[in-house]
Amino acid sequence: QRLSRGLGDVYKRQHMGWNEVYFKKDNNKFYDLSGENFYFVHSYYFDAGDKDNILGLTNYDQPFPSALIKGNIIGTQFHPEKSQRAGVEFIKRFIEWKP
């Protein structure tokens, strides 16, 4: 249900490659990674429902939630393990994170 809006339907192609992620200012653990490029490979994006759960946004002709947070769980649309320096830094901060 929440994966009902596919990027393929809107853009007629998958979102593959590098794109910037802008993290919410109220989460200072990740905020200074805003504007860094992360690697994306997907055809869908997640409709967050509750906007308070959005940790980061990416623009691909329109903004979409690319990182979500709820309690002690973080989910990303991008692949931090494939995102070189920015991804390593994101993973490091995730490991050090204390919700």
Residue map of PLM features:
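Single conserved hydrophobic/aromatic residue that forms the stacking wall/gate
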Residues: Q1-Y11
